[in-house]
Amino acid sequence: MEGASRHGLAAARATLDEATATAPGAPRPVDAGRIAEDLRAVAELLAREPAVRRALTDPGAPVAARTELVTRLFGTQLAPASLRIVHTAVGARWSRPFDLQYALLELSVEALLVEAERDGALEEVEDELFRFGRILDQNAPLALALTDPAAPAAVKDRLLTRLLAGRAHPVTVRLVQQAAADRIHGDVERRLAEFSRIAAARRGRVVAIVRTAVPLSSEVVARLGAAISRYFGRQIQLQVDLDPDILGGVVVQVGGEVVDGSVLRRFVAARRALLR
């Protein structure tokens, strides 16, 4: 997202954080799972209805008019906390109309992660999302079943419930179901990686994806994590992915930056040099 949209997302996130914060001695906390469902539903409507999306992101329309439209469209359907978040979002400026629906989808993920935080399971959910993404990478029939646009969401939900219920945290199951049902982005594996990144960010950590041809001992992982953290100047969370195709060495990806120390890269470089 560009500057204006980043500010809009930050403002809406602050409203989400305020809505889901629980002070000591406060009554029962807001249902973060309900907020997640509401925000996702609004995002999906914006994806289906470009006229509504344009009306809610029109910088020429007064903020009061945009928030009033939200109230007319969703006021009786959304929880009060969800409505406040959407009001904040449409009151912001967005670099592109699509960014509003992307922001609401991201906030729906964060709302589910609040549920995991309350359960003390945020790290567990982050790890399960990453590992299920790797399973999809190695299981083409399963990945195809979850990305099939003709398959109803209910069918995918039943499949995922059968696979994950009792084996993964309930928040993980809901997030994987959300990734599979996402018709806006489509790529389930990429969405799971993004969800894992959002979970890491909520824990104040940055994720590095480490691809290695052979399993690494816990001692090697610890040393590698310390070295990568020093290199990037911040605390880095490692997620190790076995990939025999790189032959040896490691490939480290942090966001859009890739440090390729694989044998495959050196082999390809040597081959190119010989062919010159």
UniProtKB/Swiss-Prot annotation:
A molecular-function term among this protein's GO annotations: proton-transporting ATP synthase activity, rotational mechanism
Coiled coil regions in record: none
Keyword Secreted: no
Keywords for the protein's UniProt record, in alphabetical order: ATP synthesis, Cell membrane, CF(1), Hydrogen ion transport, Ion transport, Membrane, Transport
Annotated compartments: Cell membrane
GO cellular component, one term: proton-transporting ATP synthase complex
Membrane-related topology note: Peripheral membrane protein
Subunit structure: F-type ATPases have 2 components, F(1) - the catalytic core - and F(0) - the membrane proton channel. F(1) has five subunits: alpha(3), beta(3), gamma(1), delta(1), epsilon(1). F(0) has three main subunits: a(1), b(2) and c(10-14). The alpha and beta chains form an alternating ring which encloses part of the gamma chain. F(1) is attached to F(0) by a central stalk formed by the gamma and epsilon chains, while a peripheral stalk is formed by the delta and b chains.
NCBIfam families per the UniProt record, alphabetical: PRK13430.1
Job of this protein: F(1)F(0) ATP synthase produces ATP from ADP in the presence of a proton or sodium gradient. F-type ATPases consist of two structural domains, F(1) containing the extramembraneous catalytic core and F(0) containing the membrane proton channel, linked together by a central stalk and a peripheral stalk. During catalysis, ATP synthesis in the catalytic domain of F(1) is coupled via a rotary mechanism of the central stalk subunits to proton translocation. This protein is part of the stalk that links CF(0) to CF(1). It either transmits conformational changes from CF(0) to CF(1) or is implicated in proton conduction.
HAMAP family according to UniProt: ATP_synth_delta_bact (MF_01416)
Similarity annotation: Belongs to the ATPase delta chain family.
Name of the protein in its database record: ATP synthase subunit delta
Organism the protein comes from: Frankia casuarinae (strain DSM 45818 / CECT 9043 / HFP020203 / CcI3)
Gene from which the chain derives: atpH
